[in-house]
Regions:
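Acidic, mature catalytic/reactive cores of soluble proteins
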Residues: 2-483
């Protein structure tokens, strides 16, 4: 969300027009959200309390509810409203301020960031409590654009030192592994909690087991038929009708509190907290690790662009390659549990990689590798800037690059020592080491074109994107970003 909001700020700050048209319904929703943020902007000066949080969320929820119900009942009217682009930019900037305040509030003492929180709504309050640390939260904050390079480094270092890291695969779990409570250790009410409740003591004394019972070993347990707090409330309602009305009225809230202390249903997160495979306990979810890889690379790129301290840049590079070293293609089949170059969904704590092909990891890997070799598109022009490419990746001896061209024909390009080859839009790109950057384009008609600098013009780039077959090879002489 933050990243897209920043993109919108940049986009609408640069456009040449000064107003846009939106549907009347979207306009009213925008007004509702913007007025809520504007009226509560003062809350950003400190910590937002539970009462103010409820007020803000109620107003935001009402704006959304009115928009949704209006569309459901009447569909879009077709009416249009005009919004000044300057006002849109102000709205996006204000929403960014609230997002940034939220991110800052979720920083943990250990330098990591909370990912998912629990929300408890009261009559006039909304209370926030935190769950355990999660890899997804660190990826989110690293990808958001919120952190300065030195702050990104702090997160990456803290993550490596956290319980999320597993030396077994030199990689990162979705969340720290833990032992589940044994079945016989569940549904145990502490004696001190029983002593707090006159109702529970009265029921135990009377031998009434509809809500609570005392075992032969002296332990206290809720009735086994109660599967959630709603069923516990129904049991208390029945007790009201059977002579316990005064005690139920007195202790109902306390019983609900004790029930949650025993079962912690509010913290139930599905398979992540109750299974040992897939995205469960002790599992590495490889798509999230590759998202972490890409996020680390983007923060390295930002540090370079900002002209950050070389030591900081070097440490960010170390963090990136440390994450990269834990990904499958760097491993032996024995360690990975499968062919290392094949994409797999996850690796449970008790076995090798599982679910071949079931992953979005490939997408992040492709993006990260293109960034590694320095290929990007700037204003329509293919540009080569290998800011994190290591000199050690260039060949130490002659080899060849096999590929399929735009016509589907298999081709081979010879590579000499000191070169590196890959394809882009099915066109072979051959890097050679040099102090100054230059490009040579090979055309299908046998001609060549030399270019000073690191960019191919937009028209030629479009021919490459469209796979016209006009350009058959790209030679780039350059200096890699790292040794």
């Amino acid at each position: 969300t933050r990243r897209f909001q920043q993109y919108l700020v940049d986009l609408f700050s640069a456009v040449e027009f000064d107003q846009v048209e939106v549907s009347a319904e979207i306009y009213e929703l925008l007004i509702g959200i913007n007025s809520t943020f504007t009226d509560n902007k003062h809350l950003l000066n400190g910590k937002i309390n539970d009462v103010d949080r409820k007020k803000v969320l109620d107003r935001l929820g009402l704006a959304g509810e009115q928009f949704r119900s209006g569309i459901y009942k009447h569909a879009f009217s077709g009416d249009r409203a005009t919004v000044r682009t300057a006002d849109l930019v102000k709205f996006f900037q204000l929403s960014l301020a609230f997002i940034d305040h939220t991110i800052a509030a979720n920083r943990r003492e250990d330098g990591l960031y909370h990912a998912y929180n629990l929300m408890t709504a009261g009559e006039d309050t909304i209370e926030i409590t935190h769950l355990y640390e999660m890899l997804e939260g660190q990826v989110a904050v690293l990808s958001s654009g919120y952190l300065k390079p030195e702050e990104a480094l702090d997160v990456l270092v803290a993550l490596r030192q956290s319980a999320i890291y597993t030396a077994r695969q030199n990689s990162y779990l979705l969340y720290p592994d833990r032992e589940l409570t044994r079945f016989i250790d569940k549904n145990i009410i502490r004696e001190a909690d029983v002593e707090r409740s006159a109702l529970l003591k009265a029921l135990v004394s009377a031998g009434d087991r509809s809500l609570v019972e005392k075992s032969s070993e002296g332990g206290y347990h809720f009735n086994g038929s109660l599967n959630n707090v709603v069923s516990a409330k129904k049991a208390m309602q029945s007790l009201k009708e059977n002579g316990y009305a005064e005690l139920v009225d007195q202790d109902e809230s306390l019983i609900e509190e004790i029930f949650e202390l025993v079962f912690t249903h509010r913290q139930f997160t599905g398979r992540s907290g109750g299974m040992y495979a897939y995205e469960g306990l002790g599992s590495i979810y490889w798509h999230m690790v590759s998202k972490l890889l890409l996020a680390a690379l983007e923060n390295f790129q930002k540090a370079v662009a900002d002209g950050s301290d070389p030591v900081l840049i070097g440490r960010l590079a170390d963090c990136y390659f440390d994450i990269r070293a834990g990904i499958g293609f760097n491993k032996t089949p024995d360690n990975y549990g499968a062919f290392p170059t094949d994409p797999y969904s996850h690796t449970p704590g008790f076995a090798g990689a599982k679910q071949p092909g079931m992953t979005g990891q490939v997408k992040e890997e492709v993006i990260a590798r293109l960034l590694e070799v320095g290929v990007s598109v700037v204003k329509g022009s293919i540009t080569f800037n290998p800011f994190i490419l290591r000199k050690s990746e260039f060949l130490s001896q002659a080899d060849s690059l096999g590929y399929f061209d735009v016509n589907g024909d298999q081709q081979i390009v010879a590579l000499a020592a000191g070169q590196l080859g890959f394809t882009y839009c099915q066109v072979p790109v051959v890097y050679s080491l040099a102090e100054e950057t230059s490009i040579v384009l090979h055309y299908a008609d046998g001609t060549r074109k030399s270019i000073d600098g690191n960019s191919i013009d937009a028209d030629t780039s479009m021919q490459i994107f469209d796979k016209k077959g006009v350009v058959t090879q790209i030679e780039v002489a350059l200096k890699p970003g790292l040794e």
